[in-house]
């Protein structure tokens, strides 16, 4: 958490398990290449985070000529043994000297929804305080105290381990009770109900980032 304490947060924060979304993107690529009969390139990271921000409640200015000054922070939590996401472009968390510099950490881009800023945080399953689930819970709780944060989008891996969702629910309930002005959205591959937050389907944003069009799968 020390890496995030001095950051001036914007109105929207996306907190994602990077290893999970990379794995889902891989499975979607394999399945849909077979289904539509063409090669699918790596997911466009910029396109994906813009779609996720829309899922979380961000909207473009009504006047297309108006500059959007909103900031969205994207926090990618990943295993410390992994250097990159294989199914996203760009996908390198922190570039080494010999790389071409296309890393995600501390980088930003601007688009119709404003500026997107990336932060990559490594986890370590061998240390309790650095386990991915703990980091996700801590980040979510931290955002509750950040007044300027109005929208939070959470993308955990609840498929591999049901304890992940169980550990997040108390924080989600706290946000729902004590910070009801914040819009919290959880993205998952399957519909969810009974959670103290909004839910959306993760697959839609990933398919858009992979360039799969609706007419191709009808």
Q: Where do the protein language model's features map onto the residues?
A:
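Acidic, metal-binding active-site segment of PIN/NYN-like and related structure-specific nucleases
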Residues: 152-171
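A charged nuclease-like catalytic/ligand-binding cleft shared by nucleic-acid processing domains
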Residues: 9-23, 30-153, 162, 196, ...
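Acidic, polar low-complexity linker/tail segments
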Residues: 1-10
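Eukaryote-biased recognition of electropositive, low-complexity segments
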Residues: 119, 167-218
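Short basic/hydrophobic patches in alpha-helices and adjacent helix-turn junctions
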Residues: 141-142, 159, 173-174
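Cofactor-binding loop segments of dinucleotide-utilizing enzymes, especially the Rossmann-like FAD-
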Residues: 80, 157, 189-191
């Amino acid at each position: 958490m020390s890496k995030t304490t001095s950051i001036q947060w914007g109105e929207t924060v996306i907190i994602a398990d990077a290893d999970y979304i990379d794995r889902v993107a891989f499975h979607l690529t394999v399945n849909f290449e077979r289904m539509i009969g063409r090669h699918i390139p790596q997911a466009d990271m910029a396109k994906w985070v813009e779609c996720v921000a829309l899922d979380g409640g961000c909207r473009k200015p009504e006047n297309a000529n108006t500059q959007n000054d909103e900031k969205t922070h994207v926090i990618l939590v990943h295993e410390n043994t992994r250097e990159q996401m294989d199914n996203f472009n760009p996908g390198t968390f922190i570039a080494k000297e010999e790389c071409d510099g296309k890393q995600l950490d501390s980088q930003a881009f601007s688009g119709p929804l404003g500026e997107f800023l990336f932060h990559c945080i490594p986890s370590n399953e061998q240390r309790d305080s650095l386990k991915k689930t703990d980091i996700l819970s801590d980040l979510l709780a931290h955002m509750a105290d950040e007044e300027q944060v109005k929208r939070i989008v959470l993308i955990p891996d609840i498929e591999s381990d049901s304890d992940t969702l169980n550990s997040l629910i108390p924080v989600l309930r706290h946000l729902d009770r004590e910070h009801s002005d914040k819009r919290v959205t959880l993205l998952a591959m399957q519909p969810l109900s009974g959670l103290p937050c909004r839910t959306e389907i993760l697959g839609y944003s990933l398919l858009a980032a992979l360039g799969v069009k609706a007419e191709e799968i009808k």
